[in-house]
Amino acid sequence: MESCRPSGLLWKENTEVMKKFVILATVWFAAQTGLLAQGRGGRGGAPAASQTPKAAAPLELTGYWVSIVTEDWRYRMVTPARGDYQGVPMTPEARKIADAWDPAKEEASGDVCKSYGAPALLRVPGRLHITWQDDQTLRMESDAGKQTRMFHFGDWKGTGGPHTIQGDSIAQWEGGGRGSTDGAMKVTTTNLKAGFLRKNGVPYSENTSLTEYYEIITQPDGSPLMVVTIITTDPTYLRQPFVITSQFKKEASDAKWNPTACSATW
């Protein structure tokens, strides 16, 4: 697995981008996102009702992307020690569960994909491949853990079946309009199977809901940077929403695509 870690000026720029979007995400969450989306639509105009989500896309998310690990290195690149939960607003019950985490038992059980569920997948170092499944559905694959997420636009409704590791995701465009520079994709995910926010057993429950914002930032060299703001809400194991960002650099081809199975540790 290859990861990209910027240095010098690029490191500083990317870190500032990350900080900016954490703040922005918090503002969005507090404002219930609707008012901001309305304001953005006023600038860029809403897409025509006759357009499909694919045709109306205000930003280009398709292609191959590699994660850039500029923060939380010790949680994302190595398996953190039991008890190292810094930054996660855990409830006492969540801490009790995490303190009992045993990687050997996880491996023995065969249930080793708990840290590859939707709330944690974009924190796993690796690559993403994003394509349009059809005019209404965006497909995201990860080589790490061989996971697939489906983002459904329009009035799609989940099947109401069993909870799954990637859940049911409903997507919508916010702001902009095709050709705009300030659009975003908002994804709301529910019906999740319980899993881990981090490799060392930090839990999230099946009551978890996930809100994500996908945006594209143009870097000084003209290359695109995908910034994903991830807001995890879990009334069972989190005292407040857990807000993080992940960044991805676009790659020209699938030359470095390397599917690997889930693992309980790194």
What do the predicted segments below correspond to?
Residues 1-17:
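Short, Lys/Arg-enriched N-terminal segments with co-localized hydrophobic residues
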